[in-house]
């Protein structure tokens, strides 16, 4: 779908210079002399490079709609992660580096959303929060309750995060998969 350069908004995916780009920041600029333009900071969906580009209102760009499909994580085989399409039951193999450091949070049966462009995977979204067990945590020191302090802990998947002093090894907690931070203790519903 063609749109004018001044209609590009953050989150839009556009085709530019033969690649797919997602608009990160958009700034409408109206200089004292000359025509107005849209200053767009974009990130390449394939290799992650950034680009700043000016689009005049008269320019048109191709806005791309990505298809989003739910997949279920099945298992890991070496560096390959195997997912199954929830509707067609076809399997999809993605490399671990495609998912990034969040791959450590994948659990058997977890539902993820994969963004596809012309049947090719472009991005993946994990649930925002997951329940994990702490395998190692430093003991709480007396007197640490006065100030808001955190201590290091190691999760069952090997990721290191900071947790409040009252959290101990063996407890289940909720972790934000985007920021890799402690959210809260897990309760029975979260397991």
Swiss-Prot record:
One of its GO terms (cellular component) is cytoplasm. Pathway: Protein biosynthesis; polypeptide chain elongation. Its main location: cytoplasm. Signal peptide: none annotated. Keywords: Cytoplasm, Elongation factor, Protein biosynthesis. One of its GO terms (biological process) is peptide biosynthetic process. InterPro entries: Elong-fact-P_C, NA-bd_OB-fold, Rib_uL2_dom2, Transl_elong_fac_P/YeiP, Transl_elong_KOW-like, Transl_elong_P/YeiP_cen, Transl_elong_P/YeiP_CS, Transl_elongation_fac_P. It comes from the Bacteria. GO terms for molecular function: translation elongation factor activity. The keyword Cytoplasm applies. It is found in: Cytoplasm. Involved in peptide bond synthesis. Stimulates efficient translation and peptide-bond synthesis on native or reconstituted 70S ribosomes in vitro. Probably functions indirectly by altering the affinity of the ribosome for aminoacyl-tRNA, thus increasing their reactivity as acceptors for peptidyl transferase. This is Elongation factor P. It comes from Bartonella henselae (strain ATCC 49882 / DSM 28221 / CCUG 30454 / Houston 1). The lineage of its organism: Bacteria, Pseudomonadati, Pseudomonadota, Alphaproteobacteria, Hyphomicrobiales. The gene is efp.
């Amino acid at each position: 779908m063609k749109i004018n350069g001044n209609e590009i908004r953050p989150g839009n995916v556009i085709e530019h210079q033969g690649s797919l780009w997602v608009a990160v920041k958009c700034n409408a600029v109206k200089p004292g002399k000359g025509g107005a333009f849209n200053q767009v900071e974009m990130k390449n969906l394939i290799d992650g490079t950034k680009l700043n580009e000016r689009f005049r209102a008269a320019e048109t760009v191709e806005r791309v709609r990505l298809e989003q499909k739910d997949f279920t994580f099945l298992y890991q085989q070496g560096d390959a992660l195997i997912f199954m399409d929830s509707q067609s039951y076809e399997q999809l193999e993605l490399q671990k580096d495609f998912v990034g450091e969040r791959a450590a949070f994948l659990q058997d049966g977890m539902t993820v959303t994969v963004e596809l462009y012309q049947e090719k995977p472009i991005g993946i979204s994990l649930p925002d929060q997951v329940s994990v067990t702490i395998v190692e945590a430093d003991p709480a020191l007396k007197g640490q309750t006065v100030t808001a302090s955190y201590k290091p802990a190691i999760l069952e998947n090997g990721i290191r995060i900071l947790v409040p002093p009252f959290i101990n090894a063996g407890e289940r907690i909720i972790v934000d998969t985007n920021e890799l931070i402690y959210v809260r203790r897990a309760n029975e519903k979260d397991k």
